[in-house]
């Protein structure tokens, strides 16, 4: 292995993170901040000559569902920038539901980063027990349900029909490289960091290149984090994020604050997850003002549909300026399937993303100062439309979902409070309570 996590020039960031979507990036940055680190969260790779004053850098990419070759190219670009700026440990942040297909993108990116870093062995775990994601015997559970039996089996872009992560990841690796996937079992993880390190050494000696790691609790992740103290590269969900900073002597902190919130409030929900469906239904059931986007109507005349939504929003805000408004494309699996049947999966998703990005810009230009965006793909396209480059992490709404503050050219005063929610995250009342956390 070339280098180690402890080898870095003085004053440079110790941890460099590559997130495969924007919601996951804010999720990870949130955990690192709460663990005591100073974090720079940047949207895409900064210019080569840009300096950072931080303990950790999180680079947010929109690489989860692009072609594997594009994801690899973007991730390598991020990795090279991070290493150039002195980071000693590289963290590839993936979704806690291991969102991917047989073509990737988790496996191809892991292999490319291992090659780039000359790394002979690494681990991967999507475990995030605080959000109900646990791994046992190499199988991923969402709550008490196998991943393959959860709502993720209906995901329109990355349907997860196999919970065996060893098998899922092995299928994504390049056979020509000969890397094998193994497992660090729960009974080892439950013992100690030293036991985990010993098992990793044994697996590497047996010819294993990547090990899925079981974890059922926060304590399991803490032991794993300690075991990874000198590892150059790792792959994990954001659940592992607050278990790593103590390796450099950081201590937890709850001191987070943002500038005062101003302006109107809006929610854009593009996720079709079970959790976001429930949040939309709860918001509407409790009297919230909401407008549904229909992919078929968007495909027929997107400009007309966007104008219709904006006219509705303007009327609502004339009636009550402080009223939070929800625009959603969220639908049950049957509705999603119907749109896919007529438009195709790619066009159906693209037309909704186009509408959401246009609405994000239009809403902020109309004075929205606090914006919630639900869904990784939706968040990515909206952040790009708003020309956001960096974010400051603020108070947490629910585990994994903080409010952030960002500069945006679309904002009337130059600044915007924004929360990027992974589709699967948040309590059923998330949309109802979110704006109480930003004052």
Language model segments and positions:
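C-terminal structural cap/anchor segments
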Residues: 313-374
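Short acidic, glycine/serine/threonine-rich loops at helix termini
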Residues: 28-30, 102-106, 133-141, 222-227, ...
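Conserved, well-ordered active-site substructure
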Residues: 368-369, 377-426, 430
């Amino acid at each position: 292995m070339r280098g180690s996590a402890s080898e870095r020039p003085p004053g440079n960031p110790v941890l460099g993170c590559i997130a495969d979507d924007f919601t996951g990036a804010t999720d990870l940055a949130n955990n690192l901040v709460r663990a005591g680190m100073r974090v720079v969260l940047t949207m895409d790779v900064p210019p080569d000559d840009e300096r950072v004053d931080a303990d950790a850098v999180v680079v947010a990419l929109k690489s989860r569902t692009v072609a594997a070759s594009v994801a690899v190219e973007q991730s390598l670009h991020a990795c090279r920038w991070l290493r150039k700026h002195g980071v000693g440990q590289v963290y590839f942040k993936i979704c806690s539901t291991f969102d991917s297909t047989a073509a990737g993108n988790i496996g191809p990116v892991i292999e490319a980063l291992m090659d780039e870093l000359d790394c002979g062995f690494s681990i991967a775990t999507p475990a995030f027990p605080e959000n109900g994601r646990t791994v046992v015997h190499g199988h991923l559970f969402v709550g008490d349900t196998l991943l393959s039996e959860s709502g993720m089996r209906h995901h329109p872009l990355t349907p997860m029909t196999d919970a065996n992560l060893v098998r899922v990841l092995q299928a994504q690796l390049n056979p020509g490289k000969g890397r094998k996937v193994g497992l660090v079992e729960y009974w080892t993880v439950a013992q100690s960091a030293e036991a985990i390190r010993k098992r990793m050494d044994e697996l590497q000696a047996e010819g294993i290149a990547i090990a899925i790691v079981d974890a059922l609790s926060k304590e399991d992740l803490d032991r794993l984090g300690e075991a990874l103290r000198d590892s150059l590269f790792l792959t994990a969900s954001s659940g592992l994020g607050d278990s790593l900073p103590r390796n450099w002597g950081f201590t937890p902190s709850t001191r987070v604050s943002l500038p005062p919130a101003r302006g109107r409030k809006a929610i854009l929900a593009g996720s079709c997850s079970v959790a976001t469906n429930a949040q939309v239904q709860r918001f509407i059931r409790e009297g919230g003002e909401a407008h549904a986007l229909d992919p078929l109507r968007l495909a027929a005349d997107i400009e007309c549909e966007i104008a219709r939504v904006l006219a509705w929003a303007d009327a609502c805000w004339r009636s009550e300026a402080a009223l939070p408004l929800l625009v959603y494309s969220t639908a049950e699996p049957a509705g999603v399937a119907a749109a896919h049947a007529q438009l195709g999966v790619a066009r159906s998703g693209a037309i909704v993303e186009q509408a959401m990005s246009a609405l994000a810009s239009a809403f902020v230009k109309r004075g929205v100062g606090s914006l919630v965006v639900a869904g990784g793909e939706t968040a990515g396209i909206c952040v790009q439309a708003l020309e956001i480059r960096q974010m400051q992490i603020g108070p947490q709404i629910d585990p994994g979902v903080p409010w952030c503050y960002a500069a945006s050219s679309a904002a009337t005063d130059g600044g915007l409070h924004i929360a990027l929610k992974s589709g699967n995250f948040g309590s059923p009342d998330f949309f109802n309570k979110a704006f109480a956390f930003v004052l």
